[in-house]
A protein has these predicted regions:
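Short, surface-exposed secondary-structure edge patches
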Residues: 2-6
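Generic detector of intrinsically disordered, low-complexity, polar/charged segments
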Residues: 7, 24, 41, 61, ...
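Loop/turn positions that initiate beta-strands
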Residues: 9-12
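Compact nucleic-acid interaction/catalytic patches
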Residues: 22-30, 35-72
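C-terminal terminal-subdomain/extension
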Residues: 70-127
Length: 127
């Protein structure tokens, strides 16, 4: 299988995020996620650990969450809250990562968001 993109931790990409962590199929909404890690399965499939992103309720963050402001990341249309406590492994496939035949790698986590990301990671035991 050809990889759709070269994932790297800290990348913000668009995916068809499943609605539950137990779902085995892409979800109905194409949304931003933060890539946390990558892994190659024994069968050769590339998978990435992603954290859920939403533009809802960005003015308050629960433990394990941080917000990236669109003024700090021009590639985001709206402020986006990333929830590190809502993460899952997804295969890097067209079904999850493409819309209209294109993969959308938006950009990298901006420097101004690193402190918030580190705090959120610590709160959920990732650091």
């Amino acid at each position: 299988m050809n990889d759709l993109f070269a994932p790297f931790p800290g990348a913000i990409v668009m995916v068809w995020m499943p609605e539950s962590e137990h779902a085995c199929a892409p979800g109905p909404k194409f949304r931003p996620v933060l890539l946390l890690a990558e892994n190659r399965r024994p069968d050769g499939t590339l998978e990435v650990l992603v954290a859920y992103g939403t533009s809802q309720q960005t003015s308050r963050n629960a433990p394990g969450e941080f917000t990236v402001r669109c003024q700090d990341a021009a590639f985001l249309a709206k402020d986006t809250r990333f929830c590190l406590n809502k993460r899952m492994w997804l295969p890097v496939t067209q079904e999850y990562f493409q819309r209209d035949g294109k993969t959308q790698v938006l950009g990298s986590l901006p420097a101004k968001s690193l402190r918030g990301a580190a705090r959120a990671a610590q709160e959920v035991g990732l650091a």
